[in-house]
């Protein structure tokens, strides 16, 4: 019995793999991609937040509509980890670079969690809201 569609199925699988192939990023590739950029992220298609990547592995993060938080990032155990001034608890992520930008997977104590997707990349600085004034 001859399977005439087998080569087509193999080709379709190869094309699907190449379209969805992502490269896991180490600290050096992450730094090259992000430094001097502001990235906007979404989770499950919903706007999530923005982060500006500054020289020296410094960052400014803001959930949409929230105040900016200053922080730093570093590599630990092949993960990209962040610590912010307002929240000193380490937050580690796996970052993958694909044709449509970055995908970030939160790597908490319970295993992989939240996935964020880059939806915009700009060299414009992050616009931070001022803290509440007066009481």
Where are these regions (language model features)?
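Lipid interaction determinants
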Residues: 17-70, 79-135
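Positively charged n-region of N-terminal signal peptides that target proteins for export
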Residues: 1-4
């Amino acid at each position: 019995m001859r399977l005439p569609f087998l080569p087509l199925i193999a080709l379709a699988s190869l094309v699907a793999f190449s379209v969805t192939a992502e490269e896991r990023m180490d600290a050096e590739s992450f730094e090259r991609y992000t430094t001097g950029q502001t990235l906007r992220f979404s989770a499950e298609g919903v706007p999530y937040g923005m982060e500006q990547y500054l020289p020296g592995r410094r960052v400014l993060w803001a959930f949409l509509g929230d105040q900016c938080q200053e922080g730093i990032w570093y590599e630990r155990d092949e993960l990209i980890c962040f610590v912010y001034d307002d929240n000193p608890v380490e937050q580690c992520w796996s970052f993958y670079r694909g044709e449509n930008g970055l995908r970030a997977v939160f790597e908490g104590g319970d295993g992989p969690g939240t996935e964020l997707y880059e939806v915009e990349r700009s060299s414009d600085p992050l616009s931070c809201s001022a803290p509440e004034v007066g009481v």
